[in-house]
Amino acid sequence: CEKPMAKNYAEAQKMVETAEKTGRVLNIGYQNRYRSDSLYLKEMCKADELGEIYFAKAHALRRRAVPTWGVFLNEEEQGGGPLIDIGTHALDLTLWMMDNYEVESVTGQTFRKLADQTNQGNAFGNWDPEEFCVEDSAFGFIRMKNGAVIELEAAWALNTLEVDEAKTSLCGTKAGADMKDGLRINYIHHNKQVVEKPALSGEGVAFFSGEEKPAGDYEQELFYHIVADGAEQIVKPAQAAVVTRVLEAIYESAKSGKTIYFD
């Protein structure tokens, strides 16, 4: 199933329940989990090398890259704009790294500030302002039940140079990590501040540079083995449903002006 798994949490829940009842494989297309930087950082998180992750940022910012094809600008068919399109990847990656899906509350705000402009400079060609029926940027603040917090930022069009997509920044008690300019790990060693940049592409030979396996290929191969051999899913349907629930809560909070509390 392509991301996001559904437009709202009720639909996502129904999908999870149906998969469980029928014994069918429900796999959600969060392929950014399979990138080499993501897999490396996940192993660090599993080994508790970052310690308790209590603050994180989920990044999905474009300066001017509004998708002008298909139904991306149609709220009824798409469900929303950049939040549900690319914000979903960043949030999924962040929650997965934290291994924390216990959400306490969500506060959010959406904006449609640049959609009516005709001087666009868009990477995918000019959009039609009259067809632009979704937000052009959205921001959320997510509080977890253990006290950890996540900031989510998503935009197709925003006057910023801090562009990042499907990236996460993590702050733990032992170390921190971000995906700016490659994967960077920061920590204190011998009373000094250290930044480590793992070589993830098989480097180390003067005449050869390793080639990274595309995340999409990894995802397809794993799906085959899940179906054919019973391999364990990396993207659990229940996890993807939580992502959908948080996105829906951000939209709801933006409309109501209130914080949305989870059960």
Give the residues covered by each predicted segment.
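C-terminal "lid/loop" region of Rossmann-like NAD(P)-dependent oxidoreductases
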Residues: 197-211
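Short, well-ordered coil/turn segments that N-cap beta-strands
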Residues: 22-25, 52-54, 136, 146-148
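Active-site loop of classical SDR/Rossmann-like NAD(P)-dependent oxidoreductases
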Residues: 179, 208-220
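Contiguous beta-strand/loop segments that form the cofactor/metal-binding neighborhood of enzyme cores
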Residues: 92-186, 220-231
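Predominantly a Rossmann-like dinucleotide-binding segment in NAD(P)-dependent oxidoreductases
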Residues: 32-132, 257
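Beta-strand-loop-alpha-helix segment that lines the small-molecule cofactor/substrate pocket
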Residues: 1-33, 48
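Hydrophobic residues in well-ordered beta-strands that form the structural core
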Residues: 1-2, 26-28, 57, 152, ...
